[in-house]
Amino acid sequence: MALAKEIMGISLLEKSSSFMNSSSMALFNPNNYHKENHLWFNQQFQGRRNLSRRKAFRQSTMAAISENLIKVVPEKAVRFKVRAVVTVRNKNKEDLKETIVKHLDAFTDKIGRNVTLELISTDMDPNTKGPKKSNQAVLKDWSKKSNLKTERVNYTAEFIVDSNFGNPGAITVTNKHQQEFFLESITIEGFACGPVHFPCNSWVQPKKDHPGKRIFFSNQPYLPDETPAGLKSLRERELRDLRGDGKGVRKLSDRIYDYDIYNDLGNPDKGIDFARPKLGGDDNVPYPRRCRSGRVPTDTDISAESRVEKPNPTYVPRDEQFEESKMNTFSTSRLKAVLHNLIPSLMASISSNNHDFKGFSDIDNLYSKGLLLKLGLQDEVLKKLPLPKVVSSIKEGDLLKYDTPKILSKDKFAWLRDDEFARQAIAGVNPVSIEKLQFFPPVSKLDPEIYGPQESALKEEHILGHLNGMTVQEALDANKLFIVDHHDVYLPFLDRINALDGRKAYATRTIFFLSDVGTLKPIAIELSLPQTGPSSRSKRVVTPPVCATGNWTWQIAKAHVCANDAGVHQLVNHWLRTHASLEPFILAAHRQLSAMHPIYKLLDPHMRYTLEINGLARQSLINADGVIEACFTPGRYCMEISAAAYKNWRFDLEGLPADLIRRGMAVPDSTQPHGLKLLIEDYPYAADGLMIWGAIESWVRDYVNHYYPSSAQVCSDRELQAWYAETINVGHVDLRNEEWWPTLATPEDLISILTTLIWLASAQHAALNFGQYPYGGYVPNRPPLMRRLIPDENDPEYAVFLADPQKYFFSALPSLLQATKFMAVVDTLSTHSPDEEYLGERHQPSTWTGDAEIVEAFYKFSAEIGRIEKEIDERNANTKLKNRCGAGVLPYELLAPSSGPGVTCRGVPNSVSI
């Protein structure tokens, strides 16, 4: 505990005591203060141990305090001075208006239009029947320091309080300036308990726009029924303010969290081609809720919300917006540069004469030579854009050069090999679709009356020659057969997809065989189309080639599998399962959990930026005619596929162990470190993921057990229960009646729910996101869409295919424009920002909580994450693990916790922040 005490500031008492001397007033001397009160201050500040000890202690010490107050306070209360150190973060860049207003605020600050603070005690004032308050203190030297160019500026303010004031539990801030400012933290010095920290990290709006005082609580956590009397009303008021009243159009400066359906993806006022179905609020099209903005409806469809088109920002609560360094990396710079400037330049530069890649050299030239932009489009404006790192340079001669994706870094031709195609199913950007094949042949779950026979076209003879002498049943029994099955996801949409101009798709199934050395090989691909008649041929099976024609057919079939997989990865596993499904949990947390609630403090870093990135996605990525529709096979039906998948989403199976068991990739085994035995021992995503899952679970268990020693505390925590109930009944209302929702009645229930949420926000999202450019930036390896089917021998195109199979192959891949647009966008989405906060890290790691035992537990968790990173490095150097180490094999680093900025193909941020 010595370390923790030093961290929490107890050892600073002597250093801060000199500040308490003043010639103008009587001093409060901690050494002369009654021992009982001094003890109470210090022990209240220390970490909690268990509920019964805390309550017993509080009863005895409060009795002592009450006795002392009766005897001493009326006659001997003394006044003393305490100081606030207030840290404000400056903007690096200001526009002309902001600069003018900043100077105006500096001038008017001198004449009373300033920033004032007021301390609120944890104790009640018996006279006012409200919390004890200090005098209002003015932030000093704002005008003098307004021109400082440093990232942070420290201001001070002085308060006068009585010796019976108690502990400061909250502080109010009033901004009488014309402009908002970012308040990072406040530290109060001069109390007997030592420095009191107030982590703020919030924009404080001008009083003229938001009349109420802003409330900030100290870092001391309190469960609702343990809230000190002086803070109870403030706790409730702050939550009411954050909930709002559900009415009106939200202003960008608002801090209101509320729910709405996805009714803002289309723009019917632009025409029927831009209208899109509403997602959510319909049993046929269920979807999680998103953050409400309250915009007026469109003119054409009153149920559709009008859009805010780029570059204007869409609403998210002010504190959810990207901080400046993140903005410069992503929001206003990178993605907008790509969407508004680079892509139009590409569209204007790529004529119909060079619509397709002519060969592999054309793709290679994007990295080695660059793309020639049309004259005039690159001029000074384009040259000054903060384009993604992938766009390395715009040189003289109008060249736009892309960085070489990591998939080409070790072996330029690795992507062509079947073993690499299979390896990416367990160690690529979408390692969560593969399943154990439970029976052969596989069977569809779709309605046969609508979609035809459920039976697969796969037969034993298709795969028997690839089973190393086993029968199919023997291979099944030996856990040797695996499948990536996208049949039921795509088949209901194929008629509509294939009617789109330049889009062609199958519903695919791919069978893999596990070799004796632990690697996979693809042994059959089934390609299905909707049945057009009772005797029509709607399914075909392609197997590894034995001739030249078969080789090209096999390559195109694998490309169709990759396009299917890219769509499922982006629309279901990535967007739906880690972005959209988490948003209701985040909205409910802000609405129902006080900032002083220990569970809010635990979840806070794992909610950072998610609402902003989701809002930006609705505006520019998943919207009608947006990047996702333009770049992926389903086109305008992308989000309908996502909504169809939501019908099968289950929160109780989103944790890693449950997901692995659901997919048959692991079986329970109490003798194994994580209670699971992997069927593929060298399954990099699962093997590394289980280590991280275990570390998160251990940290959450320590945390939860510290505050909830029994089920009674869980059940009686009204804020906690309201958070979970609102998440289900409002945020995921379309699935609220499902029986699989976990209960929240015991500490173990809470541990499971929180571990799953933190896993999804951190490691699961990282595994699915940061490999997008490293693997998908080379389009032949992972085409996001396909434009041609494989011709049958009776098709007129078959002769064209035979005459020039390479040309046919490239004509089936995305066009040059589609590919370059996709490459630029996924590079941006694969990028870490400089201010990224990784798993095991926290902003202000020593002061985010006032609970010393929890600080120590967090450092223990952080150390375990560091140990896991070293273990991952060792695994990537182990030649026995052939799915992550070998000639030309990429190491699996997507779950390596730390990373530098940029596109690194590694790093696990705390939250879904891109």
Curated annotation (Swiss-Prot):
Q: Which GO terms describe its cellular component?
A: chloroplast stroma; chloroplast thylakoid
GO MF annotations, alphabetized:
linoleate 13S-lipoxygenase activity; metal ion binding; oxidoreductase activity, acting on single donors with incorporation of molecular oxygen, incorporation of two atoms of oxygen
Membrane spanning stretches: none
Q: Source species, please?
A: Solanum tuberosum
List, for all copies, the residue spans of the domain called PLAT. 96-218
Chain sites annotated for binding Fe cation:
H574, H579, H765, N769, I914
Q: What class of enzyme is it?
A: oxidoreductase
Output this protein's name. Answer: Linoleate 13S-lipoxygenase 3-1, chloroplastic
* PANTHER family, A to Z: LIPOXYGENASE (PTHR11771)
